[in-house]
Amino acid sequence: MKIRIALITALILMVLAVACGTAIGPPPMSPLTPIASNGSWPSYHRDNAHTGNDPNLPTVVSVSTSWTSASLDGQVYASPVVFGGVVYTATLNDTVYALNQADGSVLWSRHLGTPQSSGWRCGNVTPTGILGTPVIDTAAKRIYAVAEIHGTTPRYHLFGLDLATGTTLLDQVLAPSGFDWTIEQERGALALANGYVYVPFGGRAGDCFNGSHPYYGFVVGVPIDGVSAQITFRTADGGEGIWGAGGVVVDDSSHDVLFATGNAIPCAGTTMSDAVIRVSPTLTSPSTFEPQDWQANWCEPDSDLGSASLVLISPTLAFTAGKHGGGFLVDPTHLGGVDGQLYPSPAGYRQADVCSGASSDATFGGFAYAAPFVYLECEGKGLVALSVNTSTPSFSPCDPTCAAPDWRAGGGTTFGPPIVAAGAVWVASDGGGLSAFKAGDGTLIYQSAGFGIDRFVTPAEAGCRVIVPSLEVIRTFVMHFAPGISCPG
């Protein structure tokens, strides 16, 4: 693989007036000198549809261990994002790092503030600095990340940093009406579209209220111009958090915004519990899908449909599943309300299992799609591939037998969400390291030595490298191809 060194000159600091206050700081270091553009993975699962699929690579033949970064200043839950030969990663200590894609050396780091480490009504992540996956604006050459910052009243901030220097170009406080930081958490991945960064919020682990005040699901749209007013969507009822690690999905054809919610509290009489919700680019005009049995089997037992983010297969077809273990194909342009799915058939509804019959804590995070399969992790049941018919929307359920053309691999392992690249499905597990399975039939292609990961961690891939957050370091693995075939780009 040829690596070309390109000098990036220093960028002039730009003063932006923003509604909630902008902090412009000095460059933390001299401008970086990255390797030439070598693949990109600018958002959670690569694209706005969250396919998690890089279709541009030849078939992998073998894999070797590459660089491991120096220890970072905190744990990494967020997926790395990659652009222009640089791997960007963010920690629970509110620091963003830029690492050279070729060797893992630190090109710059930017500490955004002191993270909040106490004061929540409930929760299971401490501190909560940067938890959700950032997103890169490849045109404006910025990375956006949301950090919880300690203070007399702790606040969530959206930061926009210059890709080359880490200079802060945008800093906006996120405090929509009715928002209570003690019971709200930003875990889901950010999305960039329509001139906004979309930021999802849900409850903290434990589903706590602040007295009688509930948490809600929020999506905040922050204008990237730094001047226009923020926009907000809030779910109709208490609970209904937008907390899955995959976060917000955007349909690039309609520009509509989609996300999935957890259970309402209480369940009865609510309208957005365990739902897929579509809103306009300005977060208005919501339409919904809810399972026919949303109250009895999803809401009441806390079996959130929104434990994972949906994946767009096409503008008119999306797959979603959640903790109760049922999967659905829906039409994002016509979600259809309760029992409005395309598959399984609304007539005489019967759940289509996706995790070998599991009906509790079945799947989390997000999915990947590479025709004809949707790939998902199943808690304690390994990796599952579901064969999808896109012409007559349906898929082969993975019931306890998980019969062909579906496949299941990885035994009883609990993986993080999968991605697809070079004809392989890549997943990581805590203590087990990185695994790669043949995309067509689940044959094991590669197994690394064991290492630890945090909850819901998903890899990234760019330049024929698979990039995995491993607690306080980033680990990378290089793909090799048949003789005479090199990495594209």
Where do the protein language model's features map onto the residues?
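C-terminal motif of bacterial Sec signal peptides marking the signal peptidase cleavage site
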Residues: 16-19
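Bacterial signal peptide processing site
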Residues: 21-23
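Short, solvent-exposed beta-strand-terminating loops
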Residues: 42-46, 110
